[in-house]
Amino acid sequence: MAAVLIVAAVVGTALAGSGYWTLWQSRNSSSAEPLPASLIAFPERKPLAEFILVDDEKGVFDLKSLESRWSFIFFGFMYCPDICPTTLYDLSLVKREMVALGIRQSDIQFVFISVDPARDKAAQIQRYVQYFDPAFLGATGSIGQLTNLTRQLGAPFRAEPETSTNVYEVTHSSAVYVVDPLGHYAGIISPPFVASDVAAQFAELYRANEGLELALGD
């Protein structure tokens, strides 16, 4: 089984269209290993600060929405012609592989967050993501609300000014961000995604942290 790579203080930034991400390492970067795997798990996890977004199911998607399960967060937009639908499809395969490895569906959730709130509305986003998997979640928010979360995860985005034809470009991260059941930023998955590899790497992380949600009451 592929081992989960652990590196020191990593922040990933991926830009749509180029499909690459840049890795910053801490002063201990000399001890970091090569990068053979898609999933990078952080040795020290940073707790996320409060944020508020909007979803179609409960009306509010916030920090509490990430508690008690592992969350896989992908930022994009519905008008995205390639990276977003491809990544969501890949994540549906990743989920299937995870379940096949014995990971409980109730312990994981996949969240697509639109960074194009001018065109993408919560109800539309939810219908869009459910095309890939009925359990996938969708959310969005104002630019300020989105920035509050994306800055915490190191997931830059930029939308061009709106036009009269409502056609414009949106630049966003192509990575998937992993948050643990305590609401801590736990890792990053960089493309290209090989479903079986990502699932196997996460299975190690998952089993090493089984029962983590119990600490919520501490």
Predicted regions span which residues?
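Short, acidic, Ser/Thr-enriched surface-loop or helix-capping motifs
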Residues: 55-56, 180
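Short, internal strand/loop/helix patches
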Residues: 126-173
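Thiol-based oxidoreductase modules, predominantly thioredoxin-like and allied folds used
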Residues: 103-120, 135-144
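Thiol-/selenol-based redox modules, centered on thioredoxin-like
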Residues: 162-218
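Short active-site neighborhood of thiol/selenol oxidoreductases, capturing the structured segment around
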Residues: 61-91
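Short loop/turn microsegments at loop-to-beta-strand junctions
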Residues: 48-49, 70-71, 173-175
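N-terminal targeting signals for export/organelle localization
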Residues: 1-50, 208, 218
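Conserved helix-turn-beta segment immediately C-terminal to the redox Cys motif
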Residues: 88-112
